[in-house]
Amino acid sequence: MGDEDWEAEINPHMSSYVPIFEKDRYSSGENGDNFNRTPTSSSEMDDGPSRRDHFMKSGFASGRNFGNRDAGESNKRDNTSTMGGFGVGKSFGNRGFSNSKFEDGDSSGFWRESSNDCEDNPTRNRGFSKRGGYRDGNNSEASGPSRRGGRSSFRGCRGGFGLGSPNNDLDPDECMQRTGGLFGSRRPALSGTGNGDTSQSRSGSGSERGGYKGLNEEVITGSGKNSWKSEAEGGESSDTQGPKVTYIPPPPPEDEDSIFAHYQTGISFDKYDTILVEVSGHDAPPAILTFEEANLCQTLNNNIAKAGYTKLTPVQKYSIPIILAGRDLMACAQTGSGKTAAFLLPILAHMMHDGITASCFKELQEPECIIVAPTRELVNQIYLEARKFSFGTCVRAVVIYGGTQLGHSIRQIVQGCNILCATPGRLMDIIGKEKIGLKQIKYLVLDEADRMLDMGFGPEMKKLISCPGMPSKEQRQTLMFSATFPEEIQRLAAEFLKSNYLFVAVGQVGGACRDVQQTVLQVGQFSKREKLVEILRNIGDERTMVFVETKKKADFIATFLCQEKISTTSIHGDREQREREQALGDFRCGKCPVLVATSVAARGLDIENVQHVINFDLPSTIDEYVHRIGRTGRCGNTGRAISFFDLESDNHLAQPLVKVLTDAQQDVPAWLEEIAFSTYIPGFSGSTRGNVFASVDTRKGKSSLNTAGFSSSQAPNPVDDESWD
């Protein structure tokens, strides 16, 4: 491939051999200390003849300590020979460059900080700095006891030489230290602060902490074995691995105008009345036509009016009475059709009528409703909707998601939690720490349920319903919503839903919204950038989302467009949560009218006035295509989707793409039809009419399409998948 071969995701490189270094039995001091005694006299800092005595006393000549980062990272560099870097009697990869002395008689092997650890102390601290060389640890950047040692590390492995976490507000459960700057292991570690307090020292991998920027790998030692754990394999799902997350998201605005801010429906909103809806299952309650027929309480009706809701969408007309009747539901409706309000309003109505159990006065919070979604951005969006509809009531909604400080999530919960909106990883962390009880759960909602049940999140969802205290499916109400429900996902859903659940299919089930004008262009891999710039220059400042397949390419294309003087930002799973929120904020406010995104932004995100979606790379599945173009043409507004079709890599999508275009009454290029009819896909019916993606109730046996080969149930392997949680 040429220099534009960006098709493959960058997989973590596996180390062929990771040595395990055991403590050298010869490195112990005379008195049985874990480390040798360090002279405390300041006169011994001289570079005169006494240095030879230092080597003799330290005993490190034959027992170098490879890859150990000691708990205290604040030594004053009183002994330059034992702590100075490389060479005889020095430790390789030692992150214990600290500003305190070993106390005589202490055999613990931990460093004790001295009281004179301050900015104006003239004693040098030569922690390795950033990309190499020595750095004065008494620099203002490392002043005070919270900055331990010099900043740095090798930009390759976690740890290395340098900075421990400057933040001491840790959970007790997380007090594990990564020892072994270059060849790491995990062991408990305490850092004495001089007053009996303990804190944690952790290695970092971000650019400021000297870690490798881009390849988030860490070596974890367990039962004498080393194993690589990467973020793509679930690194974000546990807060005890990797660098400590300190990000606390800013609270949303509390004024009423901001809470009820909404955008106007489009000219096509009235067309929703003509969309066909099919309900399958026994004894389905009749649909409602207005909000008044739902018999909601006055507070809810007031909030609905403030939010600008005047008419029910088709999915709301049928879903609200079904949920009010206490039935389990699987609802499939096109993107941007009001599915969030369809489950929030009846749940809130029940809670207002029956009363709530959780409050800020209870030690253990037991929410009545848990809403789970695959991405942080989507779950935060659901929370804002829940906060809007519950405004002025006793119901309190809380949102928790990965990439933020775990302590912040816990503090939000203990203030009272009736509706918990969460991503799977953070939810299981909170449950594992016993910060919430599940006995009062009445409603379990899976938004983007097809993604929640596939191989990406399916195991975690099964763990959730198997947790101690979680009511069985017969004792709770389970609701699933998505724009696509492949047949395989419906089979998996049987473990979560009662046998008499109802299935609501709205409009062209699993199909693209007809308010989106779809265009497919035949563009070769090496012509895509030029074509993209041409389209964006013609679009001007209209809000545009550009979808690519890999995280690396997202940053590359965003940088390329900025060089072309097109204001662009990017969002993907490798970006820090702070950066992801900043990117969305810049896109929403118009500062950057172009957002380059991977699948993180393809699901559920509701951004106002997105006029264009460009598929720079077509996705691997047709369901993902439907979700991507659904970012435009929402709530009756019109939009445009342009897709680049590469003959070398996208032929497998030709047949389903022709079907999607035909069902949405879009023009199908002749060249695409020719490819579609010349390409054989096992199980594909070839019909351009009828239901699509098997997103009809499989209990009826009506499916006319076997999606083998391109259904969303064949999700990417978790190793290659993006970190959504």
From Swiss-Prot:
Phosphoserine: modified positions: 223, 227, 723
Start and end residues of each Helicase ATP-binding domain: 320-503
Coiled coil: none
EC number: 3.6.4.13
Binding site for ATP: 333-340
MF-aspect GO terms: ATP binding; ATP hydrolysis activity; nucleic acid binding; RNA helicase activity
Keyword DNA-binding attached: no
Annotated CDD domains: DEADc_DDX4, SF2_C_DEAD
Signal peptide boundaries: none
Keyword entries, A-Z: ATP-binding, Cytoplasm, Developmental protein, Differentiation, Helicase, Hydrolase, Meiosis, Nucleotide-binding, Phosphoprotein, Repeat, RNA-mediated gene silencing, Spermatogenesis
Subunit structure: Found in a mRNP complex, at least composed of TDRD1, TDRD6, TDRD7 and DDX4. Interacts with RANBP9. Interacts with RANBP10. Interacts with PIWIL2 and MAEL. Interacts with BMAL1 and CLOCK. Interacts with Tex19.1 and, probably, Tex19.2. Interacts with RBM46.
The protein's name in its UniProt record: Probable ATP-dependent RNA helicase DDX4
Species annotation: Macaca fascicularis
